[in-house]
Amino acid sequence: MELFKVMNLPDGHLLQNGKYRLTHVVGQGGFGITYRGVWYTEVKGSLGTVKTEVPICVKEYFFKDYCYREPGSQAVKVHSETGKVLFNKFKEKLIKEAKILSEVHHPYIVNVLEVFEENNTAYIAMEYISGFSLKYMLEKNGILPEATVLKYVRQIGEALQFVHDKSILHLDIKPSNILIDKNGNARLIDFGVSKRYDIEQEETSTTMLTLSKGFASIEQYDNEGTQVFSPRPDIYSLGATMYNLLTC
């Protein structure tokens, strides 16, 4: 627990010269820490300008196997030269995720505000979605009703069709990457292992090989399986997600 406390930024920490304030940690994985926070902004109207606080989430790149913070310091440090190479490589991956998401505006996909670098690492400021993941709902309540699952699958299917039309594959569709918002709609998150393709439908961006067992398609187990654009991997993973929600 003490190690975790050293790894994340303290509650109340300010980023971007006070533009964002972090309130608390909401999640942590191998490559990043996600914080709940607020965005201090201004809303202009006919009666003038009003300062307001907008709830957001901030994803910080933190490669936990190689990174650390010294007590009392906000700067991210890396243990070794080998670690620095990997750290910089995957930092670009995080920035790529943000740039892809910033170009994708769809009612069933999380919105990104901006990406920036600070404290020797990178951050993505994004829309805060009040709700729970399908993974959490499944673990808490058991299998979902068929009509509910069908609704969510249709919504994520629409989101995937939208990104596929832009020659982007998500490549990590699973219950933990689908949030249900306060209006009861499914929202697709985490484009960290996504790939972009050019007009010839050939891969133009590469990411580390990350497979979610039980949800990854056969193509993803082949190093060349996703070099040419095809929506099949995402469709397979969406089908596996539907099966999981109805049977597990």
Residue ranges and their predicted role:
Residues 204-220:
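Conserved activation segment of eukaryotic-like protein kinases, specifically the C-terminal portion
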Residues 115:
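Activation-segment/catalytic-loop signature of the eukaryotic protein kinase fold
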Residues 158-168:
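Protein kinase catalytic-loop region centered on the HRD/HxD motif
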Residues 72-103:
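AlphaC helix of the eukaryotic protein kinase fold
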Residues 119-133, 137:
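Conserved short submotifs of the Hanks-type protein kinase catalytic core
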Residues 152-153:
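Activation segment signature within eukaryotic-like protein kinase domains
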